[in-house]
Every structure is written in C-alpha cells, then in structure tokens.
UniProtKB/Swiss-Prot annotation:
Assembly information from the UniProt record: NDH-1 is composed of 14 different subunits. Subunits NuoA, H, J, K, L, M, N constitute the membrane sector of the complex.
Bilayer topology term: Multi-pass membrane protein
Transmembrane segments: 8-28, 63-83, 90-110
Gene3D superfamilies: NADH:ubiquinone/plastoquinone oxidoreductase, chain 3
Broad class of enzyme this protein falls into: translocase
Gene: nuoA2
Protein name as annotated: NADH-quinone oxidoreductase subunit A 2
Entry annotated with the keyword Ion transport: no
CC annotations in GO: NADH dehydrogenase complex; plasma membrane
Function: NDH-1 shuttles electrons from NADH, via FMN and iron-sulfur (Fe-S) centers, to quinones in the respiratory chain. The immediate electron acceptor for the enzyme in this species is believed to be a menaquinone. Couples the redox reaction to proton translocation (for every two electrons transferred, four hydrogen ions are translocated across the cytoplasmic membrane), and thus conserves the redox energy in a proton gradient.
Molecular function in Gene Ontology: NADH dehydrogenase (ubiquinone) activity; NADH:ubiquinone reductase (non-electrogenic) activity; quinone binding
Coiled coil: none
Amino acid sequence: MDYTISEFGKVFLFLLFGVVFVIGGYVSSRMLRPHRPNDEKLTSYECGEEAVGSAWVQFNIRFYVVALIFIIFDVEVLFLFPWATVFKQLGGFALFEAVIFVTILTLGLVYAWVKGDLDWVRPTPNVPKMPEKRFDNISSGRSQVVKEESVS
C-alpha cells in the first residue's frame, strides 16, 4: 500500500499549517498581552491631531461607480492573461471568443461613458425658476392658475 501524499494533499497540508499558524499567533497574543483599556486608547488616531467630526462620512456615489468599472476591467485582464499564454495552441476559435469577450466589455464601457458615469463634473440641468406662490396653490389642491403680480 502506498502512503505518499498526493499533490492535493500537499496543498491541503500547506493550508492547514497556515491556518493553524495564524490562529495560534492570534490566540497566543490574546493570552500574553496586557489588557488595560482606557479612553485614550479607544480614540481614533489621525496623524497626531484631535479627531474632528464623525468618522462616518457619506462618499459620493461616483467613487463607487468608478471603482466598480475599474474592478470589472481588472477582472477582464485576469481572464485575458491565461488566454494569451495558450493562444497558439487554441487557434482561431480562441481569438474569436476573446474578441467577443472584449467587445462585450467595450460596449459596457461605452454605455457607462454615454450615460455620463465617467464624467466627474456632471452638468447641472437648467431648471426654470417658478415663484413660490405657484407651489402653494399646487400643494393646497387648488388647480386654478394664479396670475403673477407685476412689481413696478
């Protein structure tokens, strides 16, 4: 009977030792460190300055859109590297599939560009200014048209 470790067994042992090493380090540091919490230790550190305001800040949605577009194209590169290494063995069909893949992603980029998601400074719409008197009539339920009084 052969008791040698297969290739997957070596990977499993490597992962097992890695997990045991990390958990062992965490547990031993929890057991050996002094535990003396105070208010100064619980405050946030901002380059030696006192913290001003709340740490919870709402970011503009444009940051997230740009980050998602970056991640999509970063993953595209991850898929194209293995394809490029075996391109000669796969032939023309692989080239056709890669062209379709890149075309679909390019169409997505063009869509985001046309939609304006890549424009950092978006143009503001030109909204006509209406007198507040008209809003009062709309919210009160009266649908009569109120004539504007001219100011001389």
